[in-house]
């Protein structure tokens, strides 16, 4: 429903190749989502960025930008020079073939995926980023790779109050489960 309200209809579900991958794929089929594709990536961060580059057609979008710059480089009129200045500020030219991403990952691996998406110039102005319950990892709030990250969650203030009260009562923090 959320994606529909946001008018997103070409979703990529990103999930790492791990022991539970097949289980997640089965659960996704049971949800009967529409217009989505699954993209499985290596949990190895050294391989991840290359895989995200392929997913986002990064090399082609980079070539598109260079070709477009060449068109305006030889022209002397002000409009062409203005356009060239705009192009010089970009890393790629062209859109990716999806408008929303659901990332089924956590912790540092999630941060690696977000960083790779930012590196490959996937615009959060055009693509909606969603992940799973991330409220237990406060460090994600301070990540600067993506400013608009959506995730289903409990009310964070209530959760923090619960943790504080639990600690005061039992002199221990509650389990994250």
What residue ranges belong to the model's regions?
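Short, well-ordered alpha-helical microsegments
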Residues: 21-22, 109-111, 136-139
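Extracellular/periplasmic periplasmic-binding protein-like sensory domains
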Residues: 34, 50-72, 76-80, 96-100, ...
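Extracellular/periplasmic Venus flytrap/periplasmic-binding protein
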Residues: 1-106
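Hydrophilic extracytoplasmic domains
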Residues: 90, 110-115
């Amino acid at each position: 429903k959320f994606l529909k309200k946001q008018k997103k209809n070409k979703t990529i579900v990103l999930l790492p190749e791990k022991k539970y991958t097949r289980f997640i794929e089965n659960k996704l089929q049971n949800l009967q989502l529409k217009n989505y594709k699954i993209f499985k990536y290596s949990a190895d961060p050294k391989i991840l960025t290359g895989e995200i580059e392929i997913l986002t057609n990064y090399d082609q979008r980079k070539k598109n930008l260079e070709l477009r710059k060449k068109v305006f480089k030889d022209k002397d009129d002000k409009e062409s020079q203005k356009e060239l200045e705009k192009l010089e500020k970009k890393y790629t030219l062209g859109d990716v073939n999806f408008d929303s991403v659901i990332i089924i990952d956590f912790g540092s691996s999630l941060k690696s995926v977000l960083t790779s998406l930012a590196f490959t110039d996937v615009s959060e102005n055009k693509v909606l980023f969603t992940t799973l319950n991330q409220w237990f990892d406060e460090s994600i709030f301070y990540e600067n790779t993506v400013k608009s990250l959506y995730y289903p969650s409990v009310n964070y203030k209530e959760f923090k109050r619960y943790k504080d009260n639990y600690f005061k009562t039992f002199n221990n923090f509650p389990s994250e489960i």
